[in-house]
Amino acid sequence: MDIREIQAALPHRYPMLLVDRVLEVSDDHIVAIKNVTINEPFFNGHFPHYPVMPGVLIMEALAQTAGVLELSKEENKGKLVFYAGMDKVKFKKQVVPGDQLVMTATFIKRRGTIAVVEARAEVDGKLAASGTLTFACGQ
């Protein structure tokens, strides 16, 4: 999926759209990327002399990745996905300008409109962040 297809699925726009491309998507798994550049607005304050992507934004990027997975299903087109929670979140590596964040999300449980995914973000094959994300699909 290119950026136009991602924008058709997600309501997010600059500066909050944190998925640049989807490399693969199946019924229960997705791989996407975020190219992190020094031009990201959050680097102005986090931190000016030592820019590091905020962990909460890495988790948001993972949530958006999972959202694309859910909203790529025909029955969910035009709906919204709402973050409902995160658990077992771990940050293992700093993400800095020039990094390419490779994000994966895999469904592990679904009940009605609630879904749970295992999500991972890696840079150069090394784990940067992971967690279990819960979200709801609604109108």
UniProtKB/Swiss-Prot annotation:
Gene Ontology molecular function terms on file: (3R)-hydroxyacyl-[acyl-carrier-protein] dehydratase activity
One example of a Gene Ontology biological process annotation: lipid A biosynthetic process
Short name of any one Pfam family annotated for the protein: FabA
GO cellular component, one term: membrane
SUPFAM superfamilies for this protein: Thioesterase/thiol ester dehydrase-isomerase (SSF54637)
InterPro entries linked to this entry: FabA_FabZ, FabZ, HotDog_dom_sf
Reaction(s) catalysed (UniProt annotation): a (3R)-hydroxyacyl-[ACP] = a (2E)-enoyl-[ACP] + H2O
EC number: 4.2.1.59
Localisation: Cytoplasm
Active site residues of this protein: 46
The keyword Cell inner membrane belongs to this UniProt entry's keyword annotation: no
Keywords of the record: Cytoplasm, Lipid A biosynthesis, Lipid biosynthesis, Lipid metabolism, Lyase
PANTHER family per record: 3-HYDROXYACYL-[ACYL-CARRIER-PROTEIN] DEHYDRATASE
HAMAP family in UniProt: FabZ (MF_00406)
Family: Belongs to the thioester dehydratase family. FabZ subfamily.
Entry protein name: 3-hydroxyacyl-[acyl-carrier-protein] dehydratase FabZ
Gene name tied to this protein: fabZ
